[in-house]
């Protein structure tokens, strides 16, 4: 072998860090590949928080984040910074994950410089390019550019084939978030790490956080800003007042469009606990201990079934139909009444709860990163 093939892994958000951590680990174990992590800075604070927990460091920080940035401004800054990096670094291949602005811009910048690019979590689709916004368009555009499509499921593979993507460029791998979850559960079996998590969450929530039943909530999607978030917050308030024995724990995203309605409508309710965004370690512990989850997060839809936790998806559509079909998740929308009614049903009706909690996770077996790296090796003719 003349030299190692260099793989630049682009990521900028907390979910990207979580889902790419197993891939970075697998790349570093491959004898023919050299891995560099390039951070774009989209979610700078939350990104670096979880990167440290997941055991990797950022080799290059492009530092694109600015307060109150527009999508157009972010796109322009990303293109300038990513292209500048590529000009001097010339990787043999680049990897992106998911559907962020980083994904689309990095794919386009690599295309301009004729650098192959692999897309982890390729093929997720909803019927409209406006939902989720702007993520649906980001991933559709990226799929026209990339060289290797790492589809998490057969459904994602089928979506790519319908769009004319060549079958020999698609690898069905499972979702890397399941790899990340299994890795973290293994770490939390270590007494010192478990004690650290318990202490951290006791400080954030209270000494009874693990013994008092609770519902876990996440919500941050741009498509819900405005009336959608108002409805979600009103639903949470209604549920908290109906179930005083439960705590409703909400790690609140830093985006002001989330912070404002959440603090206005939910602050001060005795059994609603608003806490800062948590690192991945703490969040896995919360998922593992909760009764059920209300979320608009894609990653949570994929992780929670492995923990036996029902998920109510507070969106009008989802690019993850496998969970809905398997019965691990239920699409309820962002309307207050639907969120309240479906949560009541799960909390009050044991058969309905058990049916979702016992459904099988359709998103993978924890070996997705291994399959991705093996395919990259074959791309370069490596064993």
Language-model features: locations:
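Nucleotide-activated sugar donor-binding and catalytic core shared by glycosyltransferases
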Residues: 1-250, 255-383
